[in-house]
Curated annotation (Swiss-Prot):
The F-box is necessary for the interaction with ASK proteins. This is Protein ABERRANT PANICLE ORGANIZATION 1. Keywords: Activator, Developmental protein, Differentiation, Flowering, Kelch repeat, Membrane, Repeat, Transmembrane, Transmembrane helix, Ubl conjugation pathway. The lineage of its organism: Eukaryota, Viridiplantae, Streptophyta, Embryophyta, Tracheophyta. The gene is APO1. Part of a putative SCF (ASK/Cullin/F-box) ubiquitin ligase complex. Interacts with FL/APO2.
């Protein structure tokens, strides 16, 4: 577990134009410290990180368990998106709100001398990013908090695999990770046979977690490791191709089932995402995909469906189309995408679609869909230059994840037997 005391800033590429009134020191100097701490705990993470340099006491709040616990409960939800370029050494963070802006944040991964990155981005949840080891065999899954630079590894996965699909669902004191498909049946052959599930919970024994018995994937499954998984209501969802199908994993039952997607013969570059959720309510599974059909009555478009009632043992569920990209926006998007596909993620009410470039190294443009306002808009160009890395993991292209910057990710403490969970943001008192 690494926890350097030097925390990275979150510099914004755009400066706020709104001028706030200066704080009157005659008022703030006389406020009780508990009240000041309460106000600071209500600040968004980027705002507090910029303010921590104001005085030594504010900085030391970063290492106060009671303050981190309050900040975890009181700070507003931030629907950021993390663009991860393998071997680049940093994240590109997109704030998709009306005043969209970009930030850059270094990655806390250990350096690998004399070669490409040994870990590739795989999943994200609750302020944590997951990175999977590139080497074939028994996999190592690293969880990292880029804000605090905490880093911890899950126990080695029990089944040897080549390039599996990974899902992650983290809570304040729990972690569920799924590593599925690409079983190494021999040194030269892989099959999509099984999935391994890691479960850790502060209330269970042992709290440091364990790998549950392997579960069997549905027959004829074909998983794409770059597609990832969505999580909602205790179930993981991932895409299977040739033909397209949605695979559903019930964590409690340790059983997989299959749901048919809408218009499956005409989908291109489909992606499953978690729409909504956060502190406002339960997340819904949504399917975002380009639709291409030769008949003129069904024009080319990008559509978004939500699933209701899916995931039961019978594989039922109904899809409802909730959004369709307007023709003029689709024309711009299709020109930017050029048939190469796109990366997609959802966070709260926002969906981000990033066309893959010809070199597939870094995002050159990103389209934001605000589902609450039913509004499509382009994010400003990313001002940061990403140095291309050829070969190895760097050739895989960027990934985009729903990411919320958090000071406290207490669940990561479950993976370090020498560090109690309270040291990472939870406090009983």
């Amino acid at each position: 577990m690494m926890n350097p005391r030097r925390l990275p800033p979150l510099p914004s590429s755009t400066s706020s134009a709104s001028a706030a009134d200066d704080m009157d020191p005659r008022v703030w100097r006389r406020l009780p410290q508990p009240l000041v701490d309460r106000v600071l705990a209500c600040l968004p993470t980027p705002s507090f990180l910029r303010l921590r340099a104001a005085c030594r006491r504010f900085y030391h709040l970063l290492f106060s368990s009671p303050f981190l616990h309050s900040h975890l409960l009181l700070s507003p939800h931030l629907p950021f998106f993390a663009f991860v370029v393998p071997a680049a050494g940093h994240l590109l963070l997109l704030d998709p709100t009306a005043t969209a802006s970009w930030s850059r944040l270094p990655l806390p991964l250990p350096p690998v001398a004399g070669g490409p990155a040994a870990f590739s981005p795989a999943a994200a949840s609750a302020g944590l990013l997951a990175f999977l080891s590139d080497a074939s065999g028994h996999k190592t899954l690293l969880l990292a908090n880029p804000i605090t630079r905490l880093l911890a590894a899950l126990p080695i996965s029990p089944t040897p695999r080549l390039s599996p699909t990974v899902g992650l669902a983290a809570g304040p004191t729990s972690i569920i990770a799924v590593v599925a498909g690409d079983d190494l049946v021999s040194p030269f052959a892989v099959k999509n046979i099984s999935a391994d599930t890691f479960v850790a919970d502060a209330a269970s024994v042992p709290p440091s977690g364990f790998w549950a018995p392997s579960s069997l994937l549905p027959r004829l499954s074909s998983l794409d490791p770059g597609a990832g998984m969505a999580f909602a209501s205790g179930r993981f969802y991932c895409m299977s191709s040739s033909p397209f199908a949605v695979l559903v994993f019930d964590v409690a039952e340790n059983v997989w089932s299959k749901v048919q997607p809408p218009m499956r013969r005409f989908l291109r570059s489909p992606a499953l995402v978690e729409l909504g959720g956060g502190r406002e309510g339960a997340a819904r599974v949504a399917l975002v995909s380009a639709v291409e059909k030769s008949r003129l009555s069904v024009p080319r478009s990008v559509r978004l469906w939500t699933l209701r009632g899916g995931g039961g043992g019978g594989g039922g569920g109904a899809w409802t189309e909730v959004a369709r990209m307007p023709p003029e926006v689709h024309a711009q998007f299709a020109a930017a995408e050029g048939g190469r596909g796109f990366e997609c993620a959802a966070h709260g009410d926002y969906v981000v679609l990033a066309p893959r470039g010809p070199v597939a190294q870094a995002p050159t443009s990103a389209l934001v869909f605000d589902s609450r306002r039913d509004e499509w808009r382009w994010a400003p160009p990313c001002p940061y230059v990403v140095v291309a890395h050829h070969g190895g993991a760097g050739a895989a292209g960027f990934r985009v994840f729903a990411y919320e910057p958090r000071l406290a990710t207490p669940a990561i403490g479950l993976l370090d037997a020498t560090a109690p969970v309270a040291l990472h943001g939870m406090h009983d008192g």
